[in-house]
From Swiss-Prot:
In response to cellular stress, acetylated at Lys-77 by NA110 and then gradually deacetylated by HDAC4 at later stages. Acetylation enhances its chaperone activity and also determines whether it will function as a chaperone for protein refolding or degradation by controlling its binding to co-chaperones HOPX and STUB1. The acetylated form and the non-acetylated form bind to HOPX and STUB1 respectively. Acetylation also protects cells against various types of cellular stress. It is found in: Cytoplasm; Nucleus; Cytoplasm, Cytoskeleton, Microtubule organizing center, Centrosome. It comes from Canis lupus familiaris. This is Heat shock 70 kDa protein 1. PROSITE patterns: HSP70_1 (PS00297), HSP70_2 (PS00329), HSP70_3 (PS01036). Residues 617-633 have a biased composition (Gly residues). One of its GO terms (biological process) is protein refolding. Residues 2-386 are annotated as: Nucleotide-binding domain (NBD). GO terms for cellular component: centrosome; cytoplasm; cytosol; nucleus; plasma membrane; ribonucleoprotein complex.
Length: 641
């Protein structure tokens, strides 16, 4: 067998996508529902765990135990203002565990708490399985993408999520960089080009400026808004229709979670329709207190409802241009990424800002990031195809990195947007006479004072020989590797004594043991999911068999061919089984199978005798199909809402 391909995963806030590079091109892989993007949702019920479409589809029925937006929690502390403000909007509960946020849900009748890494790992496991189902062999190697402004601990935590999902994470790369790679393949050999990537997704907005020169990518600047995306546009529509419902029916549905959730689903659908049509209609039966809600909305009205949000997308564009020290006339290409860039008004605003420049939308905006990640995965696996041969990837540090010097001043060694991997060294000295040691405190951020920046870690270099202030020479080196992991070393030049810290943000990070434990738990949950699937198919098989038998003996065409006694025997037994099923929906697989054997012992002799007697064309048809029941015919889908 050829060596297995590596995959690229776009782990999104609201949706995720997976791709693979094979036979010289990228394939974006559809899930079992036929969708090329999968909701980043995980749901827990009394009987099972659902991931992706299945989880999102039942959210109206089970909002407290359906988890999404794990990407907004990952790598953050519980006390982080972002976490505190986001928590107010989520229907699921977030609890504090040693200043780490955990999501608390009820699963199989027990209260369980999961780290964001675990929730994300479940989504990653789903993406891995989607790829495996398509490729037909196990997949372990993957490139996973993160937003450009993710800091060190968020990157690390994402990597941990990959490990828990059983992946070997080849590299974590920036989403815009991935989109640029997707874009760069068809753009080699044109001299240096400045590309602006405008990524408006389901929950977040990112602007990045890259320079591409002969297959080499360099990220010049990044900007964005972590809380702007398709969901905000949905919210505007929801609020609009809640008000309309009040006007029309004098009732407020906003406190009824299920009604709002059904309305939101309809709004999301309407929004998508409005990207291609100028009008969309909503029809929701019995939305609230038995009232059917039938209404419509025009594209113009939708644009007006969201006009301030749409306009606000241009501010980060201006900021990125300033950071990259480029004028808008110097941008050669504009690339659209993220489903929300399909909105005509958003495209028009961007196009007008760049004085009518053409937008590049040849890549499906939902898939561009996974596309690039798949290419990058192929490169890292040593793919020799000429399409990827000449591509080299330079990434950047999203925030300045430095240390605290006298008076709480932030002294940056690695400036924001520096190309990584990179290494910077600077000499520092002591602040007071005979100072025995120095405390090296490492920060990330753009503010002048360290108190306004984010402390990544600290360590001490002790044993400095007594000397007047300003005499000792302490050499500090900041070294970032290709994954954005930071090593800081301090060396006393006189003694050669050194100390170092690797910032994978240990305070915010999971320990090796915790990751191990989570890997095992992930396996356990996966096994439980399998058991649950088998159980359900055994139940369905029994149910179909019972109903098939019942309808067989009640068939008008069999009158006179079966004795009333036999008929009663079969019907009574079927009825007994059907009643037992209603009372024991949660029985185990072998109980269902045992019941089925019991039922077969009663039915088979009668049915076989019946058909041998009848001898008709139907003889084999029914007996052959029935014992299979539901199990052979694939999963059955129950409609929700």
């Amino acid at each position: 067998m050829a060596k297995s391909a590596a995959i690229g995963i776009d782990l999104g806030t609201t949706y995720s996508c997976v791709g693979v590079f094979q036979h010289g091109k990228v394939e974006i892989i559809a899930n079992d529902q036929g969708n090329r993007t999968t909701p980043s949702y995980v749901a827990f019920t009394d009987t099972e765990r659902l991931i992706g479409d299945a989880a999102k589809n039942q959210v109206a029925l089970n909002p407290q135990n359906t988890v999404f937006d794990a990407k907004r929690l990952i790598g953050r502390k519980f006390g982080d203002p972002v976490v505190q403000s986001d928590m107010k909007h989520w229907p699921f509960q977030v609890v504090n565990d040693g200043d780490k946020p955990k999501v608390q849900v009820s699963y199989k009748g027990e209260t369980k708490a999961f780290y964001p890494e675990e929730i994300s790992s479940m989504v990653l496991t789903k993406m891995k399985e989607i790829a495996e189902a398509y490729l037909g062999y196990p997949v372990t190697n993957a490139v996973i993408t993160v937003p450009a402004y993710f800091n060190d601990s968020q990157r690390q935590a994402t990597k941990d999520a990959g490990v828990i999902a059983g992946l070997n994470v080849l590299r974590i790369i920036n989403e815009p960089t991935a989109a640029a790679i997707a874009y760069g393949l068809d753009r080699t050999g044109k001299g240096e080009r400045n590309v602006l990537i405008f990524d408006l997704g389901g929950g977040t907005f990112d602007v990045s400026i890259l320079t591409i020169d002969d297959g080499i990518f360099e990220v010049k600047a990044t900007a964005g808004d972590t809380h702007l995306g398709g969901e905000d546009f949905d919210n505007r529509l929801v609020n609009h229709f809640v008000e309309e419902f009040k006007r029309k029916h004098k009732k407020d549905i906003s406190q009824n979670k299920r009604a709002v959730r059904r309305l939101r689903t309809a709004c999301e659908r309407a929004k998508r329709t409005l990207s291609s049509s100028t009008q969309a209609s909503l029809e929701i039966d019995s939305l609230f207190e038995g009232i059917d809600f039938y209404t419509s909305i025009t594209r113009a009205r939708f644009e007006e409802l969201c006009s301030d949000l749409f306009r606000s997308t241009l501010e980060p564009v201006e900021k990125a241009l300033r950071d990259a020290k480029l004028d808008k006339a110097q941008i050669h290409d504009l690339v659209l990424v993220g489903g929300s860039t399909r909105i005509p008004k958003v495209q028009k605003l961007l196009q007008d800002f760049f004085n009518g420049r053409d937008l590049n939308k040849s890549i499906n905006p939902d898939e561009a990031v996974a596309y690039g990640a798949a290419v990058q995965a192929a490169i890292l696996m040593g793919d020799k195809s000429e399409n990827v041969q000449d591509l080299l990837l330079l990434d950047v540090a999203p925030l300045s990195l430095g240390l605290e010097t006298a008076g709480g001043v932030m002294t940056a060694l690695i400036k924001r947007n520096s190309t990584i991997p990179t290494k910077q060294t600077q000499i520092f000295t002591t602040y007071s006479d005979n100072q025995p040691g120095v405390l090296i405190q490492v920060y990330e951020g753009e503010r002048a004072m360290t108190r306004d920046n984010n402390l990544l870690g600290r360590f001490e270099l002790s044993g400095i020989p007594p000397a007047p202030r300003g005499v000792p020479q302490i050499e500090v080196t900041f070294d970032i590797d290709a994954n954005g992991i930071l090593n800081v070393t301090a060396t006393d030049k006189s003694t050669g004594k050194a100390n170092k810290i690797t910032i994978t943000n240990d305070k915010g990070r999971l320990s090796k043991e915790e990751i191990e434990r989570m890997v095992q738990e992930a396996e356990k949950y996966k096994a439980e999911d399998e058991v649950q699937r088998d159980r359900v198919s055994a139940k369905n098989a029994l149910e179909s068999y019972a109903f098939n038998m019942k309808s067989a003996v009640e068939d008008e065409g069999l009158k006179g061919k079966i004795s009333e006694a036999d008929k009663k025997k079969v019907l009574d037994k079927c009825q007994e089984v059907i009643s037992w099923l209603d009372a024991n929906t949660l029985a185990e697989k072998d109980e269902f199978e045992h019941k089925r054997k019991e039922l077969e012992q009663v039915c088979n002799p009668i049915i076989t005798g019946l058909y041998q007697g009848a001898g008709g064309p139907g003889a084999g048809g029914f007996g052959a199909q029935a014992p299979k029941g539901g199990s052979g015919s694939g999963p059955t889908i129950e409609e929700v809402d």
